[in-house]
UniProtKB/Swiss-Prot annotation:
Organism: Mycobacterium marinum (strain ATCC BAA-535 / M)
Listed pathway(s): Cofactor biosynthesis; thiamine diphosphate biosynthesis
Keyword Cytoplasm (UniProt): yes
GO biological process: thiamine diphosphate biosynthetic process
EC number: 2.8.1.10
Record-linked CDD domains: ThiG
Keywords: Cytoplasm, Schiff base, Thiamine biosynthesis, Transferase
Assigned protein family: Belongs to the ThiG family.
Name of the protein this chain belongs to: Thiazole synthase
HAMAP family: ThiG
Enzyme class: transferase
Gene name of this polypeptide: thiG
Length: 264
């Protein structure tokens, strides 16, 4: 069991795995995966939300007791992202938002300039902002300085499954951050999630790695276990890396007691 909770702004969560909902073939498959993951916080694209209720995604999250985290997926400018966040606040009655401002459809990488502009406006408007950002320590610090409640650097581009391509930068972000760091995007399998936590991240957000797996529920369970294992390993402290081997058992030295020589 994870020994302490994930705290972002004024909310605490027992699970350090945040799930996305994109890519699931249907709600039944998504439900199985969400239950298996143990997540308590799940992103939803506001453009997919049926604000009138019904039997859709929001009803599912409500039945499972999972907090929805609206995101601004698909937005290409600060103005568009701010408007989408404001619509989400009205539709879902929450001031939390996962902020995404994408530079282009080919890479789905964040537009750093528009991202900071949107973050500044949303923080001023009373939002709890969780920005999806590049693995850039300087940009992460700038977002924190604007008042973001967490920073969410990518491991690799969305949906690639390449894992963490620049672990050193993630470590630098963790080392200088005064807010939670959530590894977001690029996770391909459980070992990637474990590595993120070992590098010092406070949580992992993933979607495609689960929703497009051959067995989404099984992969969700694996991701949950990996996040816990990586977190506990980080707290336990890994041994230093060494160039040469070092025996784990002490060398035994056999000596004769005084007067034991033959003939005496």
């Amino acid at each position: 069991m994870v020994e302490s909770k994930l705290t972002i702004a004024d909310r605490s969560f027992a699970s350090r795995l945040i799930m996305g909902t994109g890519g699931a073939s249907n709600l039944a498959v998504l439900q199985e995966a969400l239950v298996a993951s143990g997540t308590e916080l799940t992103t939803v694209a506001i453009r997919r939300v049926d604000a009138e209720g019904g039997t859709g995604l929001l009803d599912l999250l409500n039945r499972l007791g999972i907090t929805p985290l609206p995101n601004t997926a698909g937005c290409r400018s600060a103005a568009e992202a701010v408007l989408t966040a404001q619509l989400a606040r009205e539709a879902l009655a929450t001031n939390w938002v996962k902020l995404e401002v994408i530079a282009d459809e080919r890479t789905l990488l964040p537009d750093a300039i528009e991202l900071v502009r949107a973050a500044e406006q949303l923080v001023d408007d009373g939002f709890v902002v969780l920005p999806y950002t590049n693995d850039d320590p300087v940009l992460a610090r700038r977002l924190e300085d604007t008042g973001c409640a967490a920073v969410m650097p990518l491991g690799s581009p969305i949906g690639t499954g390449l894992g963490i391509t620049n672990p050193h930068n993630i470590e630098m972000i963790v080392a200088s951050a005064g807010v939670p760091v959530v590894l977001d995007a690029g996770i391909g399998t459980a070992s990637d999630a474990a590595l993120a936590m070992e590098l010092g991240c406070d949580a992992v957000l993933l979607a495609t790695a689960v929703t497009r797996a051959a067995d989404p529920a099984a992969m969700a369970a694996a991701m949950s276990a990996a996040v816990t294992a990586g977190y506990l390993a980080r707290r336990a402290g890994r041994i230093p890396k060494r160039f040469w081997a070092q025996a784990s058992s002490p060398t035994l030295v056999t000596t004769q007691s005084p007067g034991a020589e033959s003939g005496n």
